[in-house]
């Protein structure tokens, strides 16, 4: 299984979306709820309810990029039973990765942020991305984190029993 972001066109609108793909094809789509700055010029806010999907023994929810800024979104996925939140991103704020550590800790689940690196040149300026893709454990611990620049592949063992133990 994998999760990837993509621009989606549906019913005459465009969405910033992510898809969960399994052996038999697309299993689920999530449309970003919280649009960032000028995204509203191109995309509509998501109109699909938050959901959790089975991936083997794990229950996985999805957020996209700026959704990190809204704790209730991660909490809603936790209340739906998520063990893991997958978070494909183009993060530009340097504190976003730390906020995802907090989301993991608040909700006792794992977060997996796949973030863009490098700089995009646009009319009127450039946008530097923060890199530092990461996998965070349910106690807010960094299981693995990439550097700010360059491509990489990462993996970490996740104990689902710990993700499901909500006792403090």
Where are these regions (language model features)?
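Short helix-loop capping/hinge motifs at secondary-structure junctions, enriched
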Residues: 25-28, 141-143, 163-165
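Glycine-rich, aromatic-flanked loop segments that form ligand/cofactor-binding clefts
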Residues: 7-10, 118
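Short beta-strand element of the conserved SAM-dependent methyltransferase core
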Residues: 20, 53, 135-136, 156-158
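Short, intrinsically disordered/low-complexity patches at protein termini
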Residues: 51-53, 110, 120, 166-167
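A short, polar/charged loop-to-alpha-helix boundary motif
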Residues: 32-45, 150-167
């Amino acid at each position: 299984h994998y999760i990837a972001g993509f621009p989606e066109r549906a019913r005459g609108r465009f969405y910033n979306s992510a898809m969960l793909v399994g052996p038999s094809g697309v299993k689920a789509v999530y449309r970003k709820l919280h649009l960032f700055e000028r995204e509203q010029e191109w995309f509509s806010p998501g109109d699909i309810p938050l959901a959790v999907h089975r991936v083997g023994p794990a229950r996985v929810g999805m957020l996209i990029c700026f959704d990190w800024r809204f704790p209730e979104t991660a909490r809603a996925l936790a209340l739906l039973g998520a063990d893991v939140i997958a978070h494909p991103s183009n993060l530009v704020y340097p504190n976003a990765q730390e906020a995802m550590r907090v989301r993991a800790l608040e909700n006792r689940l794992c977060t997996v942020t796949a973030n863009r690196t490098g700089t995009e040149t646009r009319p009127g300026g450039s946008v530097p991305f923060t890199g530092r893709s990461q996998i965070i454990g349910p106690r807010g611990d960094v299981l693995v984190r990439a550097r700010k620049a360059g491509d990489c592949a990462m993996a970490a063992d996740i104990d689902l029993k710990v993700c499901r133990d909500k006792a403090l």
